Each structure stands twice: as C-alpha cells, then as structure tokens.
C-alpha cells in the first residue's frame, strides 16, 4: 500500500472517532501542533524513525512537542500508530486530518 492511502485511512478513522466523541476541534489543535512540530523541528522525524528510541519515549516526544496539553484521544491514537510501526506516516496523517477538519468546517 502506498503512503497516501495508509495515511488517509488513519486520518479518516481518527476524524470519524473524534467527531463521534465531539472532540474534532480538540484533536485538530493537537494535530496542528504535531504538523507544526514536524515543520519546526526536523530532528523529530529522525527521533521517531530511530529504533533505539523506545515507544514510550516517542509518545512523550509527540505529546510534549508543542508544549500544550494534548487530549486523551490524541495520545491513544499516537500509541496506536506507534504500536503498528507507522510513525513515519505521522506528518502525513496530521496534514490529512487538518485538511479533513477544514473541509468539514468550511475553513479555507
């Protein structure tokens, strides 16, 4: 499967769950923070792809990256992605989630 397809499926699943729980705006803020973190901190990608860095350490990095308190749904999602060894897809998932949210809310 290609990166776009996999990333899109994860982003759509997260958006659907967040919407069902009424947390799509909160998750949007967290995903925006994640996307911004990847843009501002290029080393973040390297740390995520480093097999020496443990999953709990990667979760800490991704939840503390933007300096804001993240919601539980975001943290659970990050754990799921890392458990399936899809951390390299996180930037793409974040951008797709942001696009889905903006499309839904008619934000240009």
What are the roles of these predicted feature ranges?
Residues 1-108:
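Elongated, mostly alpha-helical coiled-coil "stalk/stator" tethers of large membrane protein machines
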């Amino acid at each position: 499967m290609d990166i776009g397809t996999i990333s899109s499926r994860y982003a759509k699943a997260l958006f659907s769950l967040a919407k069902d729980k009424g947390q799509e705006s909160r998750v949007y803020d967290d995903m925006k923070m994640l996307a911004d973190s990847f843009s501002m901190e290029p080393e973040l990608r390297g740390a995520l792809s480093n097999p020496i860095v443990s999953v709990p350490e990667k979760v800490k990095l991704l939840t503390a990256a933007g300096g804001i308190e993240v919601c539980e749904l975001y943290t659970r999602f990050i754990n799921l992605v890392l458990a399936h060894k899809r951390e390299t897809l996180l930037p793409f998932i974040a951008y797709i989630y942001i696009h889905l949210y903006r499309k839904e809310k008619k934000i240009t």
